[in-house]
């Protein structure tokens, strides 16, 4: 049976990572792939939606001359419009990526790549998010085409996808992170989220009128515990596969109830 796949990202519709993933998946599977992605770079936007401005959908041509839909909004907007306006149905899968830069640890809540995947799961689709580690900072937020070769990563994502395709989906979102030097022979490790991916840093600068302005930055954390996504990708150089859920309820709900319910 032909699968219906909605392909999105947060790096913009002309990203090489999105195109590589589209081409590799279309070669392997019997699938209708619809690309709906932001017109512009949307990294760090999380699961934000546009409430105070109208959205536009523009048909466009990707680098391989196939058709895509550019949305003047966030990755989550792309999923919403993809489901309700472009496809007019919930696809079998929402796949988000390939992101330029890893999405690890609890900071995934800031990721537009993960935001789109969670929105897909919220609509009832099976969802995957996939990201490639990038150690060259100036490439991480590049808009449009990039000199990075995404084909190895696309094949790795395809191989991981194949493991789940015939099974009941085990979670809401599968988060795949690929080390920058990975090949199809790189080990795949099932992981949990690390506490932190970056140590936050704020850089203050002064503008020509002597007023302060700020850049938010961070330093990569390497010393997370074994078994986490950060340790798998950055220390062991393994592909990380992390099952995620939309339900943010604390794991210790019963303990919380027992301790606090009588206080209300």
Swiss-Prot record:
* Record flagged with keyword rRNA processing: no
What's in the keyword line of the UniProt record? Cytoplasm, Hydrolase, Metal-binding, Nucleotide-binding
Q: Name one GO molecular function term.
A: nucleotide binding
Give the Enzyme Commission number.
3.1.3.5
Q: Where in the cell is it found?
A: Cytoplasm
InterPro entries, alphabetized: SurE, SurE-like_Pase/nucleotidase, SurE-like_sf
The name this protein carries in UniProt is: 5'-nucleotidase SurE
What is the organism lineage in this UniProt record?
Archaea, Methanobacteriati, Methanobacteriota, Methanomada group, Methanococci
